[in-house]
Amino acid sequence: MIIPWQKSTLYKHKTSIECLLNYSFMPGTPETALDNLALVHTYAALTSTSTCKICQTLYSLISKNTPAVSFYEDYSLLCLTCLYAPITWTSTLMTAADFIEIIKTHFPTSDTSNFYAPQSLLAIDIQLHFYIHRCFKVLSSNDILSTSSLQFLKTTFLQGKLTGSIPGQFCFKTAWIKNDTCCNNTSHDLPSNLSSVFCKADLQLKPNLLPIILDIWSASDLFKNNVSNSEQPFFTYPEDIDICQGPCLLSPSLGLTQKNNTTSICPLCECIASHPNAIDTLQTLKYTIINCIENNVKLLDRISFILSNDELDFIQDPILKTVIQNCSIQEIHKHFFCDPQCALNIKKTSTNILFKIPDPNLLKVLCARLATGEHLSKNYYLDCEYLETLALIFKCSQTCKVGKTTFLEIIRELDLLSKKHNIPTVKAFQTSQIYA
C-alpha cells in the first residue's frame, strides 16, 4: 500500500523530481521564451484541443499490462488525497513524487528514465489531471457538457496567463454557464467511512515537508526572509533561468508576480500543504486577529500589532513560526480575508487525510471502496466546480490582459458564488486592485 504525501517518497525519486524542477523555471531572458521546451510543452497542454497526458499515460500502460487490483487502490488513494489537498505548488510537487512511485511499483518494466521531461510529462500535466480538471472524479453523464465548458474557461485563462492576454474575441458572458444549483453539498463533514480511517486522534503524523519547500525556494523571492538550515540542499538551481521566480511552473499561478508585499504564490497556503499543524495554527492566528481589539481598528493594523508584539507563542514548531513571522502583514491579510483561492484552500483542505497515517487494515478496506469510485465524486467540505473555475480565472485575470467588461463580469459572478457558499472574503474587485 502506497501512502501519499511522504517525505521519503520525495527523496526516493529525487532524480526524477530534480528533472521536473529543472523544467519548472521561467527562462532567464525573455527572448529565449519561444524556444523554451518547458514553456512550449505547457502552452500545448493548455490548448483546448489537447488531450490529458496523464490519462493517456495511464491508458497506455493499462492497455499493455494488466495491473493488479492494488494499482487501482493506490491510484484512487492518491486521487482522494488530491481531492482534499490545497491547490498549491507543494501539492503539485508531492503528487508528482507519488505518481511516479505508483507507476514504478505497478509497472516495473516501463521506462521511467525520462518520465518528467518535455514531450513526456511536466508540472502542468500533474496540475491539470489531479487539481484543475480532476479527471479522476466520478461524473454524471448529464454533467459532461457543462464540465467541458468549465474546462475550456480554465485552460483559456491559464494559457492567457502564460502569454499575457486573452484572445480579443473572447466573451465571458457567452462562455459562462449560469446554474442555480451549482453543487449539492448538504453536509460539510466527512462521512464515517473516511473519518473512521483518517480522523482518529491517536494516529501518527507524517513528517512535515516545510523544510524541504524552504530549501527548494531559498534562492528565489518566495520565502526570501526565511533561512534554509539544510546542510545538503535537496535541489540546486540550473543556469540560465529566472532565479527570482524560482521553479514557479509547478504552481497554478504559472509565475511568481509581486504586488504590495504579496506574491502570486501564497506562502501560507504552501504551509497548509506542507505542515500538519498549519491549518490549526492559522485558524488560531485568524481568531486572534479578529478578536484582539474591540475597537474599529483596521485588519492590517491588528495584524501588525500581533506580529510586532510577538504574540505567536502558541506556535510550537519553530520553522512554521518563523515562516509566519516573516510574512508581511499584507500577505497575512490577503490569505485570511481577501484571496478567493486562499479561502477555497482553507475550506477544502483536510489535514487528517494529508498527514495522518491510518491503520493499515482499515485503510485497505477503504481503498477497495475507493477503487470503485466511491468518495471520489466530490470533496465533502466544499465542492463547487463553478466557484473553483471563477477563482482560478480571477487569479489569471489579475496579471493577464482581459477586457474591462470581462473582468467586471468575472468579479460579479465570483462575489455572488462566494457569498452563496459562505466564503468570507472582501469584494474581489478590492483584492484585484491591491494584491498579487
Swiss-Prot record:
Its main location: host cell. It comes from the Viruses. The keyword Zinc applies. Disulfide bonds: none annotated. It is found in: Host cytoplasm; Host nucleus. InterPro entries: Herpes_env. Residues 52-135 are annotated as: Zinc finger 1. Pfam families: Herpes_env (PF01673). GO terms for cellular component: host cell cytoplasm; host cell nucleus; viral envelope. Zn(2+) 2 binds at residues 266, 269, 335, 342. Keywords: Host cytoplasm, Host nucleus, Metal-binding, Zinc, Zinc-finger. Residues 266-342 are annotated as: Zinc finger 2. Zn(2+) 3 binds at residues 182-183, 384, 421. Zn(2+) 1 binds at residues 52, 55, 129, 135. One of its GO terms (molecular function) is zinc ion binding. Plays a role in efficient localization of neo-synthesized capsids to nuclear replication compartments, thereby controlling cleavage and packaging of virus genomic DNA. Belongs to the herpesviridae UL32 protein family. This is Packaging protein UL32. The gene is 68.
